[in-house]
Amino acid sequence: MQFGPFENKDVFAAEKFSQKKHLVSKSVELVLFRGKKAIFLEAKSSIPQSSDDINKIFLPSIAEKLSDTLHLVASDYMKILSERDSLLDPLKGRNWEQLSINYYVVLKGMPKDQLPALHNMFNAYPLLNKLKKIWSPNKSGWVKVINDVKARDMGLIASGND
């Protein structure tokens, strides 16, 4: 799946930046600035079939990506990162105190009826719950688990995008 199309000024390509600079081990694919939202986006083409694998491998990996990306963004905001890289430009001048942090996990081909259970699993996961308390305390269900159909409807991926 490919996200977009978006204007470059609205997208922090977190994964590309972290791979280039080796600053964090994992990161979400991108942070999209849309209105008063900072949308942290991650996409997966599949998920493990067993709930044990989901809980022991999948959820920890996704949670680590969000955590590392939040640290990366915060360190840039606090001017700890002294990087001069155009990939950081979309972070500059953002009024973070006015932005709502949202986390979307897009699961390709996931049937709509399976999304609520996954949504609940993500939002109950301890690390994600802890991050929510710090970064988005007034928001319930801050991790949104959606499929590619919903992502397309929301304008997060292009029509016909596979």
Where in the sequence are the language-model features?
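Polybasic (Lys/Arg-rich)
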Residues: 112-162
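Conserved catalytic cores of phosphodiester-cleaving nucleases, focusing on short active-site segments
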Residues: 30-32, 39-45
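Short, surface-exposed loop and linker segments with low hydrophobicity and enrichment for Pro/Ser/Thr
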Residues: 23-35, 90-99
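Structural motif
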Residues: 37-39, 102
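A short linear-motif detector with a strong N-terminal bias
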Residues: 9-10, 19-20, 80-85, 115
